[in-house]
């Protein structure tokens, strides 16, 4: 063996050239690249969910401040007083204060408590409207948050709400059954409709690896066109109506009103709170929830521990869809009992994504975030009626909240909050989950 060759007869590899490439490693490079991108996506989602409550609070404050800037810019008196800003600056700043304070005061009175009400019913009506509007947001937000914690981006809550409302509404206006039985079957039908619709994305993800974001977005469009077609059929269309409207929901299938006929608040709100408690127990105390968290923390480690990732994916999507379907039941069986329309879901499915992010995908946080967004919706109507502020400002504030929640470092930089160091709670929880799975 010469000094220029190895014992096997090959030329030595220069140290600066690094190790020789291995064909097997080259073939695995695309797979590793795909896994790296998936890991980055999961890491971003964890950072969003792990922003602490201080960051969340300041994100809302920042969004409200920017909303105040837009309110001032949209006010006619502010624009008029800007013409003599240097001559009378106090008039300009006074106009800004009156516009912003008046708008947010009206927003509060329309969402929480109206001190100018003539009686108790008028005073507490705003908070009951907030709870009514927040009900579908809480249901759908719980489903989306459950998917987030399991590593799935379920963007299809809008379509799942529609399918839940379709099936629940069909049972509600077609069959004549005893009171309790009819309501239970209609609500279960709504949950089943949402679960089946979400399971399509889950099965495609589990069997073919299809991206659940794209599939659920496409299913949203399919659901929108599907309900439009169904309302043109004899089975769904109200007899004698020229509009795409179904028959009214029978009294036996409606959610009972909690405070009497003068308020719209119904039993669905209490069911949403019970659903939040159920999701908490599922994710924190059950074996199935442990599997969900393990797959969300590290699918490869979960697979090594013997957990069926495809089966878990289908289960997660089905449960998330059933919760979104219950959001549809809250609409058709509780709030909009006059009949099924193609706008029954409004934009609750899309707003629920923000609710889940703001609530950090936790049940308690989701309930609070749902109430916040319900209050913005309820108060925005009075804000526009009393001050003339465009109700679109509310949508802009919601968008700013999404922006700041999705960028915790930006919020920390704006308000000079200390940066977090060490292991995050997500990493600690992932390590704990891995230990539990290994045990």
Question: How would you label these PLM feature ranges?
Answer:
Residues 2-63, 68-76, 277, 304-312, ...:
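Cytosolic-side transmembrane-helix boundaries in multi-pass membrane proteins
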Residues 52-56, 129, 133, 156-165, ...:
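Alpha-helical transmembrane segments of multi-pass membrane proteins, especially transporters
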Residues 70-72, 76, 101-175, 187, ...:
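Single transmembrane alpha-helix segments in multi-pass membrane proteins
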Residues 106, 110, 216, 220-285, ...:
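Transmembrane helix-bundle core of multi-pass membrane transporters
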Residues 196, 262-338, 363-368, 438-439:
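Helix-loop-helix "hairpin" substructures at the membrane interface of multi-pass membrane proteins
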Residues 318-324, 332-399:
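Transmembrane alpha-helical segments in multi-pass inner-membrane proteins
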